[in-house]
C-alpha cells in the first residue's frame, strides 16, 4: 500500500465506524432493497422482485429509492431505457445525500426522437454545488436491451461506467481546496419524469403524450458498499477491492476513447461559460 492510500485508509477508519461487518449485497431484489416513493402505482416490482419498471404519463411520473444509505462503494444497475419517441422525458439514476448542502453523483438519460441517439448526462455535486456537466451519446441503442450503469465511489475518485467501461472520472482533489463527497451517506434514487422544457434539443422538442405511457426497466441491482445507519457505517469484511481501486492504463485508454468519440459536452472546455478560466479540477 502506497503512502497516499494508507493515509486515505486511516482517515476513512477514523471518520467511519466499522463496528459491524456485513456481506455485500449481490443482485438484491427490488422488493427487499427498494421503496417506490412516488407515482401512484406507476412504479411496479415484477417477477418476484427481479424486475422494476417506472412509467410516465401526462398525469405523473414515478420514482424509487434504496432502503439503505451508502458511504463509499461500487453500485451497479442494469437499465433498459424508454423506447421509441421518448423526447421530453428524463430517466434519472443517481446517488444523493440529504440536506441543503447535499452531495450527488448523477446519471440522467435525456429522451430522443425515434432514431436519434440518447444523451447521457453526468454531474457531480458537492456541498450543494454542481455545474460539472459532461454529456455523451451512447454508442448502442439503450432501449433494445439492458445495459449496466455503475458508479465507483471511493476516497480516491468517482468513476462513471457503462458496461464496465469508464466514461468519466472525478478525482479527490481536496488538497487543492476542491470539495469531494466523503462524509455524507447517499441513497440510490431513480425517477422517470417529464422535462420537455429543456431535455430534448434544449426544449424545442416536446413530449408526445400520444406515445404514453413511457416505461423504463431495471434489473440486477448490486451494491458492494459500506452501509450507513444511525451515524455509523458498516463495511464488507476484509479489504474490498473497490476501496483502493484506481484506473489502470488500460481503463484510462478506454475512457479517453469514449470521451474522444462520444462526448458531446464538457464543462471543462466551455469557454463561454467560464470566460475567466475553467474550474481548478479541469486541470487534472
Swiss-Prot record:
This is Probable xyloglucan endotransglucosylase/hydrolase protein 25. Contains at least one intrachain disulfide bond essential for its enzymatic activity. Residues 1-27 form the signal peptide. Its EC number is 2.4.1.207. It comes from Arabidopsis thaliana (Mouse-ear cress). GO terms for molecular function: hydrolase activity, hydrolyzing O-glycosyl compounds; polysaccharide binding; xyloglucan:xyloglucosyl transferase activity. Glycans are attached at residue 112. It is an enzyme of class 2 (transferase). It comes from the Eukaryota. One of its GO terms (cellular component) is apoplast. The keyword Signal applies. Induction: By auxin. Not induced following darkness. The active site is at 104 (nucleophile), 108 (proton donor). GO terms for biological process: cell wall organization; plant-type cell wall biogenesis; xyloglucan metabolic process.
